[in-house]
Amino acid sequence: MLQPLFAMANTSPDQLAVPGGIVKIAVADKSQTAPTVLFNNNRVAVSKNNSHWFALVGIPLSAKAGTQQLLVNNSQKLSFTITDKDYPAQYLTIKKKRMVTGFTEQDLKKINADKIAISKAKAIWTEQAINTDFIAPVDGRLSSLFGLKRFYNNIPKRPHSGLDIAAPTGTAILAPASAIVIDTGSYYFNGNTVFLDHGQGLLSAYLHMNKITVKPGQQVKQGEPLGTVGETGRVTGPHLHWMVYLNNTPVDPALFIAKDIPRL
């Protein structure tokens, strides 16, 4: 059975305190008002559990091992420690060479415009209660893990910032939790993409889609269709690249769902 993150009673934040992971930290006791929490100048999601407030913090893949700090209500500083994690390398061959090198002027204009649109989408913050009760968004095979050091045609690129689930073109992609559609678009690298808002900076994104069946501003419930699996953008075959953001930071989506997805 899939479990919401806050229901994982046996999960210690220390076990998740790695680059690309998450930490859950008690930030206030018995206050009726939600505290304002910042990490690296980004708002952090908070949730009340048994009369205590907790912050759910996303750790950047670029974070270094050691002590980190939260700023609570612009006055109190809370420290926590993260440990290092060595993500393995992955080498992929991309047949469309212009998806890796040799971009035209028109390509670069599109890529730059996409960066602006994506940055705007993933910076969204709404005050609605955070919803971490996730299910897997597609029925498929887990084909590429989060955090891998990516090499395209032997050229080093940014680490893999999502979870790849391989499935045939046309396979339904479902909302993992109730949400509001932030935006949709067709991007150079990401292909057809949907962004969802699950509250307080918890966002999710669905890349390389074939068809998109939702519109910006639309409310979706858990299990409702967002579109279908495809192979648009920079891909090696049909799959869903699923991303989850906390405080404007990509984190491992596997932390939000059961660990028994079939793997390679």
PLM feature segments, named:
Residues 2-4:
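N-terminal signal peptide c-region/cleavage motif recognized by signal peptidases
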Residues 7-88:
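Cationic-aromatic interfacial patches
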Residues 41, 70, 142, 165, ...:
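Terminal peptide-recognition signature
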Residues 79-190:
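Surface-exposed, glycine-biased beta-strand/turn segments
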Residues 145, 184-185, 209-212, 229-232:
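Residue-level recognition of beta-strand microenvironments
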Residues 172-182, 214-229:
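Short, well-structured beta-strand-loop connectors
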Residues 176-210, 238, 243:
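Zn2+-dependent peptidoglycan hydrolase active-site motif and core
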Residues 193-197, 218-264:
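Conserved, short, structured surface segments that act as functional micro-motifs
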